[in-house]
């Protein structure tokens, strides 16, 4: 399921980074949002990380199955702790603009065995 209801503002793929000006891989998709909007777990899983990551700001990482992870960076608040089990649709964080960000949004990534993949291949847009 989609983690947030906002429209997609940036797709997965190579682009000019709006903060650094570098041309590089955008490892996820960006959804427009407002400060405090709920961010929901796209799939059931276990919280592997809940804290600050350089560039990503406040971030939740959920582990799912067979090396699949979902990442939820730039959050305003983090509502879950490491080791906590979450169900699909649970509110795990709220939209913010922490880390390298130009405004409130959710950057959403899916990684398989540590490698980013296009989230739109796995969830509806």
What spans do the regions from the language model cover?
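Catalytic cores of peptidoglycan-degrading enzymes
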Residues: 2-125
